[in-house]
């Protein structure tokens, strides 16, 4: 696979993981997953992690995966490169895993005394990637190993933080986020 093809493949494969957290923010509100509970004097997760956001984010990412599968032949032909398709299990693994990764990061932030929205460099950019990849591997191991080769994983780990910083900066400038990270 050529370098450009690898980048396109990697970004396409990760789209169902890139969307859930954005959809969760847009869905907003609802009951916090931690129910307001504290541990060691700090919230377990905080108000930003809700059942509604988790469900809507997971549904959005899964729906996107299934939609991408429908258009993959046309997009592949237009771009002149092969692209992966997504089984329901793969899409669900990526989407739900992205949400779990973000929830895990919130837990770690609370344990280290960081408030909601506080920056945690590195973790903020890759938490959902780790969750998505782990859950996709568990949900669809054959698909995962065929889709996420070492070069593809390298692109994901390098490109995702850049995309994260750029998209969050745009969301901040548009008034959709309170912080630019």
UniProtKB/Swiss-Prot annotation:
E.C. numbers: 2.7.7.67
Membrane topology note: Multi-pass membrane protein
Annotated compartments: Cell membrane
The name this protein goes by in its record: CDP-archaeol synthase
Function: Catalyzes the formation of CDP-2,3-bis-(O-geranylgeranyl)-sn-glycerol (CDP-archaeol) from 2,3-bis-(O-geranylgeranyl)-sn-glycerol 1-phosphate (DGGGP) and CTP. This reaction is the third ether-bond-formation step in the biosynthesis of archaeal membrane lipids.
Lineage of the species this protein comes from: Archaea, Methanobacteriati, Methanobacteriota, Stenosarchaea group, Halobacteria
Required cofactor names: Mg(2+)
GO-annotated cellular components: plasma membrane
